[in-house]
Design a protein with these regions (language model features):
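Patatin-like phospholipase
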Residues: 1-176
C-alpha cells in the first residue's frame, strides 16, 4: 500500500511537517496549504495552527522520503542542472513583513535558498549512488507563470522529457 504525504510549513515554528494526505486530509486542507505561499496567499488553518507551502522549510523533501522508508527516489525538479537559488529582494521584503508576527517563518524564508542549494547537491549525490533518478527541464521554469499557453507548453515539455527517458525510468524502477 502506498502513501500520500503532504509537506507543509508551520507558520509559528517555521519548520516542515508531513501529514498523511489519505487519512488526515479528507477536505484537502493540507493540500491547499502546499500551495499557500506566504504573503501571496492566506495561511491555511489545520488543528488550530497556520500553515504554508511545505517548500518554504523543505524545498526538496528527499531526506524526509528516505527517512520515511523510501529506498530510491524519482525526483522531479523545476530548474535545470547547475541552477542555484539566490536570496532575492522579494524574499527579503516578504521576510521583513512576516518577521513581527512569524519570526521563525521569516527566518525559514531567508534561509530557503541555502537549504534548496544543499538539497540539490544531496539529490545529485543520491543520483551518483544510484539511489535517485532526477528529472529536470533544460531551461528554467517560472514558478509564478500565469500565461495559460506558456503553462501548456511547459506541461508538454515535461511530458516529452518523461517520454524521452521512459526506458531509463522503467529500468530504475525495475531495480527496486
Amino acid at each position: 500500500k502506498g502513501k500520500f504525504v503532504v509537506g507543509v510549513t508551520n507558520a509559528r515554528t517555521g519548520k516542515s511537517e508531513y501529514l498523511d494526505g489519505l487519512t488526515d486530509d479528507r477536505k484537502f486542507t493540507a493540500s491547499r496549504a502546499t500551495c499557500a505561499m506566504p504573503l501571496l496567499f492566506p495561511s491555511i488553518r489545520i488543528n488550530g495552527e497556520k500553515y504554508y507551502d511545505g517548500g518554504v522549510a523543505d524545498p526538496i523533501p528527499a531526506q524526509h522520503a528516505l527517512s520515511d522508508g523510501c529506498g530510491r527516489l524519482i525526483l522531479v525538479l523545476t530548474q535545470p542542472k547547475g541552477y542555484r537559488k539566490r536570496l532575492g529582494k522579494q524574499t527579503k521584503a516578504a521576510a521583513r513583513l512576516l518577521s513581527v508576527k512569524y519570526p521563525a517563518l521569516s527566518k525559514a524564508l531567508l534561509e530557503r535558498h541555502l537549504v534548496y542549494n544543499r538539497q540539490v547537491l544531496f539529490c545529485e549525490e543520491l543520483e551518483k549512488q544510484g539511489r535517485a533518478l532526477i528529472l529536470r527541464p533544460e531551461s528554467p521554469l517560472d514558478s509564478f507563470e500565469k500565461d495559460i499557453e506558456t503553462l501548456r507548453q511547459t506541461y508538454r515539455m515535461g511530458h516529452a522529457l518523461c517520454e524521452s527517458r521512459m526506458d531509463e525510468i522503467k529500468a530504475f524502477i525495475a531495480q527496486a
